[in-house]
Amino acid sequence: MEKKHYGAIDGLRMIAAFGIVMMHMRANNNYEISGFVYNNVIPSFTNFVFLFMTVSAFGMCCGYYQKVLNNQISWSDFYGKRFKKILPFFCLLVLLDVAMSHSLGSIYEGFADLTLVFGFLPADTISVIGVGWFLGLIFVFYLIFPFFCVLIENKRRAWMAFGVSLIYNFICTSYFDVGRTNILYSACFFLAGGLIYLYREQIAHFNQWIVLGITCISIILYYVIGGYSVMCLLVSSVLLIYAILKAGGVLQNSCLLYTSPSPRDAHES
């Protein structure tokens, strides 16, 4: 089958990355600018991490879903590739942080960071490269990806798993007191990406203007209702669906494509 690349997803991912950088810059600067955009919109960019979860699951499915189900993948190569891609630069950041902290606790945490499996630790355990929690969560997703593919092997099972993940998201907040750093809390976003992958052929026939309208409405509702999980899930899903439909335009301009991360996993094999 000819490989298909969803180029607009690269642009969407890069816009989300810029948004998260803006959020961190606002949180750490020493000056104040009044206005709705500065006080409400930019802080909400922290929830772009949920879009990354949905896009990551979709991209992984494009690259590996069929290979996993057909037993056509070398897991040594799969995980080795991810260690080689993530660890060198992250290791440098961790070592610099440990050197600046120079405490026994930072050494323990640095060790956990360098294994890349610190996503299994309880929330708020790691302060060395504390913002790297998302990397830990994504690596947990990589580790359970074979099971993830089994969960979405067919649409019926995928919908059942998605329903269970929504319940988990609710009870994680209301009872277990864990948040987005936990894989069970965030599972619904990854499964949403998997479901969108399963329906990608049907989605290709959607009217992009109608989807754009739904996307705009969902973003407005997000700011009216609030950044609850269900709204983050809705916005992330419709943005991904629109990116699948959209070719060219602002999501696929040369500047964004040049600065976007490697799109290799977003090729459908």
Residue ranges and their predicted role:
Residues 1-170, 258-261:
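Membrane-cytosol interface segments of multi-pass membrane proteins
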Residues 10, 53, 110-133, 144-236, ...:
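Aromatic-enriched alpha-helical transmembrane segments of multi-pass intramembrane proteins
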Residues 64, 68-69, 196, 244, ...:
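Hydrophobic residues in alpha-helical segments
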Residues 237-241:
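Generic alpha-helical transmembrane segments
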Residues 255-269:
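Residue-level detector of conserved catalytic or cofactor/ligand-binding positions
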